[in-house]
């Protein structure tokens, strides 16, 4: 796979998930506001994954992903060490294949886990409900992107079940 094919694959599966979730939310009767709101929240998080994790698919998305990746991997020393041993062409593939996951983990993973822990401490059922949805959707996004990488044999060692901080 080349960079564009990797990007297109990640973009397509994320966009499909977003559209399905958005359609599900629209199909729920307004007399069920909790279910509808939960689905709208899920749809919004998938949209964040598209807008931020995949840089909205802009023409410069691949270039920006490559540029930003170098700073973000500092949070994951094992991945960074491996990255710096690669030839340039392999580095470019790794940048695109891992950028969305690295971005979401750095910017949202700890926040969503901390939000859930705090909500559970506070005991507010509505906040717990929202925090669980956020964490569930983020986990789904990360798993979806990881599955894509595994199916395409792209840096399958990264985030292989061991939490990296």
Describe these PLM feature segments:
Residues 3-19, 41, 97-113:
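Short amphipathic alpha-helical heptad-repeat segments
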Residues 50-94, 103-104, 108:
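Long, low-complexity or tandemly repetitive, helically biased scaffold regions used
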Residues 15, 19-22, 26, 71, ...:
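Basic, mixed-charge low-complexity alpha-helical segments
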Residues 22-37, 54-59, 84, 88, ...:
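Charged, low-complexity interaction regions
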Residues 141, 148-151, 155:
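Soluble, cytosolic/nucleoplasmic coiled-coil alpha-helices used as oligomeric scaffolds and tethers
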Residues 33, 37-51, 57, 94, ...:
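Alpha-helical oligomerization interfaces
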Residues 161-165:
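Short acidic DE-rich linear segments
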């Amino acid at each position: 796979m080349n960079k564009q094919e990797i990007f297109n694959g990640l973009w397509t599966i994320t966009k499909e998930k977003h559209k399905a979730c958005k359609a599900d939310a629209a199909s729920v009767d307004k007399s069920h506001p909790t279910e509808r709101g939960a689905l709208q929240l899920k749809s919004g998080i998938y949209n964040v994954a598209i807008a931020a994790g995949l840089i909205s698919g802009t023409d410069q998305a691949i270039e920006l992903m490559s540029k930003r990746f170098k700073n973000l991997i500092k949070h994951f020393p094992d991945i960074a060490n491996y990255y710096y041993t690669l030839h340039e062409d392999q580095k470019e593939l790794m940048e695109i294949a891992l950028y969305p996951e690295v971005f979401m983990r750095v910017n949202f993973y700890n926040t969503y886990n901390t939000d859930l822990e705090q909500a559970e401490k506070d005991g507010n059922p509505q906040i717990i409900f929202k925090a669980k949805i956020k964490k569930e959707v983020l986990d789904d996004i990360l798993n979806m992107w990881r599955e894509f990488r595994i199916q395409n044999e792209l840096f399958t060692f990264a985030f292989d079940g061991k939490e990296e901080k």
